[in-house]
């Protein structure tokens, strides 16, 4: 086999491997997608709730590579079918918003939605994630707005340096007028790779299936 043919075959196999890299699975009623590139695994689920103007995505990252990588929520974006991009916000921005506008209901929704997703998914074992952050976040702060901000600071994905073998998880907040993300692409530029996950509008898919069953 010539060197050229070898290179072409390698490229084809690489593209095929990437096309099949997305793993779909379900846990406790939530749907997850996962992908591993360069030894770093990214897993996510769309949380079935929103806080204020934000659509929320739970993201978990596990560094199985041989070098350290820094991950942050700003690495995440959502591309709509028309090409419009929705950039995920830094954790500090979300926390400040909830200090200004948050309430008791926001605290309850945040904690309930995130913990239900996290604790019912046996695939997530973070070394630097929510469980380690929450210990100091939920002290008696008095104000419901401060409690909402504390909940967000514990739950939100924050800028984290992951050494080989380390992992983290957190919620990523997308400003989307309080609506679900819907159909599009979830894009994460992390660990020197670009993770692209196609998304479908769950409501639209359900309606399509119902119409398909009509004789």
Tell me what each language-model feature is:
Residues 1-5:
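Positively charged n-region of N-terminal signal peptides that target proteins for export
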Residues 20-215:
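Conserved functional micro-motifs across diverse proteins
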